[in-house]
Amino acid sequence: MASSMFSSTAVVTSPAQATMVAPFTGLKSSASFPVTRKANNDITSITSNGGRVSCMKVWPPIGKKKFETLSYLPDLSDVELAKEVDYLLRNKWIPCVEFELEHGFVYREHGNTPGYYDGRYWTMWKLPLFGCTDSAQVLKEVEECKKEYPGAFIRIIGFDNTRQVQCISFIAYKPPSFTEA
């Protein structure tokens, strides 16, 4: 005798309950909100600061090669480099020294549109300086790289390991043989 099992499925329905929501009637009148307004007869309330700006002339970009951040400025001194490195350390970025022997600037090798290998990838000098707390450590690595490769362009980058992005990059050294034209 074979035993058989019967299964029955019962569908239970419940009546849909209608929820009463009032239709949107627009914004309320502004008369119900207390607002104090300042009279616009005062010159200091104008948003433009045109009268207080002292303009600074930029480094001329004509005939200059485009490098990285700060590329149109004059070369940075050791003190200015140390300040930039201190800035990236304050932001908790990892400093890294990189060098390029042939092209220290953006160039187009594989067509006229930006491509994968068009002057954007440099050789890393040693490993990134994880745990670095002093700009002197980074500048020491730049000096070592200069001694090893005196004809190379050297740059310092700041890498944010939380967001996995490069946040800053600037030229630390241009070879003496380099001409701008």
UniProtKB/Swiss-Prot annotation:
Keywords: Calvin cycle, Carbon dioxide fixation, Chloroplast, Photorespiration, Photosynthesis, Plastid, Transit peptide
Gene3D superfamilies with a match to the protein in the record: Ribulose bisphosphate carboxylase, small subunit (3.30.190.10)
One annotated GO molecular function: mRNA binding
Location(s) in or outside the cell: Plastid, Chloroplast
GO cellular component terms listed in the entry, alphabetical order: apoplast; chloroplast; chloroplast envelope; chloroplast stroma; cytosolic ribosome; plastid; thylakoid
Tree of life domain: Eukaryota
Transit peptide feature, positions: 1-54
GO aspect biological process, one term: photorespiration
SMART domains: RuBisCO_small
SUBUNIT field: Heterohexadecamer of 8 large and 8 small subunits.
Cited PANTHER family: RIBULOSE BISPHOSPHATE CARBOXYLASE SMALL CHAIN 1, CHLOROPLASTIC, RIBULOSE BISPHOSPHATE CARBOXYLASE SMALL SUBUNIT 1A, CHLOROPLASTIC-RELATED
Reported function: RuBisCO catalyzes two reactions: the carboxylation of D-ribulose 1,5-bisphosphate, the primary event in carbon dioxide fixation, as well as the oxidative fragmentation of the pentose substrate. Both reactions occur simultaneously and in competition at the same active site. Although the small subunit is not catalytic it is essential for maximal activity.
Note, other: There are four genes coding for RBS in Arabidopsis thaliana. The basic functional RuBisCO is composed of a large chain homodimer in a 'head-to-tail' conformation. In form I RuBisCO this homodimer is arranged in a barrel-like tetramer with the small subunits forming a tetrameric 'cap' on each end of the 'barrel'.
Family, as annotated: Belongs to the RuBisCO small chain family.
Protein name, UniProt field: Ribulose bisphosphate carboxylase small subunit 2B, chloroplastic
Species whose genome carries this gene: Arabidopsis thaliana (Mouse-ear cress)
